């Protein structure tokens, strides 16, 4: 026999060791496993969805959201609600690719890149600290703006003290509702008209309302 036929036979024998047919049965499970791993991996996106509301004229855990002392206060039969946004995918609240994909398909959610919300590499501790700082600044600015308004309308606010209590809510966007709630407490004007009114917006110490994100 010639050399070429022997090489062909040897090649066929080697080929049997590497029969690709068994891989056909493994390809499906391998692809499925890879897909699952991708879906459960942390996402590089932030998911924003509607969050809970809080009545600034009411209480949270037994404490008045807006506690005013040193002046006469009044009750409002209605509610002034501050609205919030639930954010997943921020430091300390990871979101998977699967969750981001489902949110992308939902008309009630917004999906945006993480770098548009917080600096890359920011820790959960620093994120929470910054968010709480924004909330504290928002409350202080709202109190200052409300006092300026009340004083301009003839109310004596020299002895007025204000403290605000709210749990698990950060950011600056509740300032407008805090200011309205404080003014309503002191004037007794029933700003709600006995109804339930929801609102949002930042507010600086001079009473200027600013834009907010996420809603």
Regions of interest found by a model, annotated:
Residues 1-173, 180-190:
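Intrinsically disordered, Ser/Thr/Pro/Gly-rich linkers and terminal tails that flank
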Residues 171-192, 197, 201-215:
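Glycine- and Gly-Pro-enriched alpha-helical subdomains that act as flexible
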């Amino acid at each position: 026999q010639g050399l070429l036929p022997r090489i062909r036979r040897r090649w066929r024998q080697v080929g049997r060791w590497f029969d690709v047919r068994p891989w056909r049965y493994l390809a499906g499970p391998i692809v499925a496993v890879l897909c699952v791993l991708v879906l459960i991996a942390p996402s590089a996106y932030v998911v924003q969805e509607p969050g809970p509301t809080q009545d600034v004229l009411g209480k949270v855990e037994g404490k008045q959201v807006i506690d005013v002392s040193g002046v006469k206060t009044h009750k409002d039969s209605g509610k002034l609600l501050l609205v919030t946004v639930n954010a997943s995918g921020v430091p300390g609240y990871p979101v998977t690719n699967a969750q981001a994909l489902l949110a992308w398909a939902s008309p009630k959610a917004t999906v945006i890149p993480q770098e548009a919300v917080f600096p890359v590499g920011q820790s959960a501790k620093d994120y929470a600290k910054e968010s709480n700082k924004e909330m504290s600044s928002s409350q202080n600015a709202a109190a200052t703006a409300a006092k300026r308004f009340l004083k301009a309308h003839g109310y004596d606010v020299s002895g007025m003290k204000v403290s605000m209590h709210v749990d698990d809510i950060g950011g600056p966007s509740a300032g407008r509702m805090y200011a309205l709630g404080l003014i309503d407490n002191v004037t007794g004007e029933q700003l709600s008209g006995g109804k339930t009114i929801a609102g949002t917006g930042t507010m600086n110490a001079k009473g200027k309302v600013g834009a907010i994100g996420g809603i």
